[in-house]
Amino acid sequence: MKLNELYNNIGAKKNKKRIARGVGSGKGKTGGRGIKGQKSRSGVAIKGFEGGQTPMIKRLPKRGFNCISTKEYNIINIYNIEKALIDGRLSAADTITKEKLVEVGLINNKNNKNLVKLLSICSDDFSSPLSLKLDAYSSKAKDLIKKAGGKLL
């Protein structure tokens, strides 16, 4: 067998039907679109319209709601505060507040609207005695700060 002797099986490769190429082709004149009307024109597809039956979007029930009292937190890790202390961007003598964290660039708090929560992910040791005034703390973060001799205001 040679490469020039290879061929497709019979019926494996079929030419597609060319529509709207004369009445003798079997799909001529209107090209399978019917006569007149919106759907016979080019470029028309009515999104969500299912031919008069109730659309899927109306058949499915409404679900859930957006709670207006949900609190949105900016998350900060103890590791990031410790790194800022080492870099000299924060001072251990000062009380660390939301405004101070924004000023240093540890959090992005537009219009001072969001609350700040301190977490202790990947931090098992924390040695700096800090005084912090933030909105929320994880239980592990509280324990680490108190163990280091810090204060939560």
From Swiss-Prot:
Pfam families: Ribosomal_L27A. Keywords: Ribonucleoprotein, Ribosomal protein, RNA-binding, rRNA-binding. GO terms for molecular function: rRNA binding; structural constituent of ribosome. Residues 23-35 have a biased composition (Gly residues). One of its GO terms (biological process) is translation. Belongs to the universal ribosomal protein uL15 family. The lineage of its organism: Bacteria, Pseudomonadati, Pseudomonadota, Alphaproteobacteria, Rickettsiales. Binds to the 23S rRNA. Part of the 50S ribosomal subunit. One of its GO terms (cellular component) is large ribosomal subunit. It comes from the Bacteria. This is Large ribosomal subunit protein uL15. Residues 21-40 are annotated as: Disordered. SUPFAM superfamilies: Ribosomal proteins L15p and L18e (SSF52080). The keyword Ribosomal protein applies.
